Swiss-Prot record:
Its main location: secreted. Expressed by the venom duct. This is Turripeptide OL47. Residues 40-49 have a biased composition (Pro residues). It is found in: Secreted. It comes from Iotyrris olangoensis.
Amino acid sequence: TSCNAATGRSPGCFCNNDNNCRDTCCPRSDTEKKCTGGPDPCPPRQWPD
């Protein structure tokens, strides 16, 4: 699975783009901040390929 920070895989989620290719569920308003290397306090979720 490839990560894509521009498009989340489900509503309210976006690619955290870390080495584990995890999507992190956060409010959409947080997407820009977190996708540009901000701190990530949200619990990570694994999404299937």
